[in-house]
Every structure is written in structure tokens, then in C-alpha cells.
From Swiss-Prot:
EC number: 4.1.1.37
Protein family membership: Belongs to the uroporphyrinogen decarboxylase family.
Organism annotation: Geobacter sp. (strain M21)
Subunit structure: Homodimer.
Classification of source organism: Bacteria, Pseudomonadati, Thermodesulfobacteriota, Desulfuromonadia, Geobacterales
Catalytic activity: uroporphyrinogen III + 4 H(+) = coproporphyrinogen III + 4 CO2
Associated pathway: Porphyrin-containing compound metabolism; protoporphyrin-IX biosynthesis; coproporphyrinogen-III from 5-aminolevulinate: step 4/4
The name this protein goes by in its record: Uroporphyrinogen decarboxylase
Amino acid sequence: MNTRFLDACWGKPVDTVPVWLMRQAGRYLPDYMRVRSKCTFLELCKTPELATEVTVQPVDILGVDAAILFSDILTPIEPMGMELDFTPGPVFAKPIRTMADVEALKIPKMETDVPYVLDAVKLLRKELAAKVPLIGFGGAPFTLACYMVEGKGSKDFAALKKMMYADPEVYAALMEKITTMDMEYLNAQIKAGAQAIQIFDTWGGMLSPADYERYVLPYTQRLINGLDRTNIPVIHFVKGAGTMLEIVKQAGGDVMGLDWHVNLGKARDILGDMAVQGNLDPTVLFAPNEIIEREVKRVLDENAGRPGLIFNLGHGILPTVPPEKAIFMVDCVHRLSRK
């Protein structure tokens, strides 16, 4: 098996910088669209054989150094008692607004409530055995709360922030419950065979550093501390957190995910020996090849040869990116960083 990704997570020497892409199994790939055309998004998430097929596609097509389970961060929320639909974005029919709503949420039994996720992990370990490691993942408690309280995507998640400030007891009770669920969900993925875990906090960066420290950090800290992490690296990605890396680092984990709004070299100076993942602007993949190569080289140069770099985009790959651009980017990373 290609162990570059896991080695880099632990800061070990590698022959070339490993690379994978957030949302690498997705709409930009014709092979993915062929599978997706036969089912709904939720059916794809809930059918282990199909989830396995689309998870493996980018490994074979792009030549990336890790696979990430095909699923959605909101998958474990539905069995907590919230009706979820994708039309096309995520929508909860009845958002959480009161203490009674929080108390009505249950902690799912992962083996019986989301067996399709765990079955996909087991299938993937067999499928990928001679290829690359498998990353399991979940949403951070704060980002999950954003969707559960708002009921759908939002630019400012005002309903969640209103709860945070005006109903702190309800907010705390909700966050505690989500954190407990999240811990059990990610530990179930680890038990099923996930070789690394990524925690996505897509909306954590919309808070001030002080609010992040008060309202988010304790829960992410508790989540990471509660994972069965023996030989399982944890990647913590908070989009938009470039101004508060010192605080985010306190959450724990082994690898800090970085978006493209931060200079990777300066981030490494702040983070010390902690491994990092990132951080190319996803829209660079629309550029001519010479610009893609220039930007890949810039990120590698900012790293200055330090161990513990996993190359990635600063957020998910966009659906309209030509696949050949992603293939070229992966090749650039390997070629330019080869020892």
C-alpha cells in the first residue's frame, strides 16, 4: 500500500508530497455522474456498493494518495430524529429551536442506524487494500449545529448565532448532544476500518476568535479527545480560521487543514511541528496548466521542504472543473516535490 499520506500525517519523511482533494469523488467526474444518474444523492450515500464505487474512482483516475469515504456530514443527523432532504441542498423539515427539540434528539446506535456507512468502510478497506489509505470523516459539532438550527444552508446562520447568544443553555445542551453523537459516529468508522479521520468545520471560521474559543473549542476538543486514536491521525479543518490558528490548534488533532486565505509557510510557523493539509485555491484548477503548475510550486515553496505536508485544495473541488486539470495538478505535486 502507498503509505505517503499516513507518513506525512505523522511528520515522517516521504519520497514525494502526498495529495488528495476534498470532494474528490464528485460531480466533476463523468464516472461519478454515470453512477449518480441512477439514484438520488441520499440513495448513493446509503448504498455501500455504490458509495464504494465512487470513493475508489478518483484514486484510479487522479492518482491521489488517499481515498475519502463518500458520504455527507449530515448522514448521522437523520437518525437522531431529524427528517433530511436534499433539494438539492440539505433541508431539515423541523429545525431545532427549543430545549424540548434538543431533548427529543436521540443518540443513534451506529451499527443499526447507519449500517450503510460502516459497511461502505469495510468494503473500501478490502477494495483499497493494495492501493491507498481510507479517510473517514464527520462534521464538527458547530457546523452540524448550524444546519440543525437553521434548517438549511445559510450565509450567516443567524438562527444558530441567535441561539448561541440569547439561549446559551439550549445551545450548550445541543452541542453536548451532537458531540456525543459525533464521537460515537467517528469511533464506529474507526472500528470499521477507517485509517484516518477528517473533521470538517466548514462554518467555524465565521465566528470571531473570542466566540470560537468560547462557543466551539470546548466541544471540538472533547470530540477529538474522545476518539480511539491509536495510530489513527485526525485532520481538523476549520474553513476561514487563518486568523485564529493558535486557538484552533488547542482543539487537538494531528493535522491542521488550511484554506487558501492563509500563507502556508506562516501557518506552519504558528503551528510548529503540527502537520498541515492544503491549501490551493480550488478555482486555480480553471487556469491554464502553466498557472496550475506555478501555484502548486508556490504552495510547495511556502512549505520550504518541511515534513508533514499533505497537499490539498483549500476547500472542495468545484463541480465544473475539467478532470484533466485535477489529474495535472496531482501530477505536478508529485513531480515537483519528488525527493
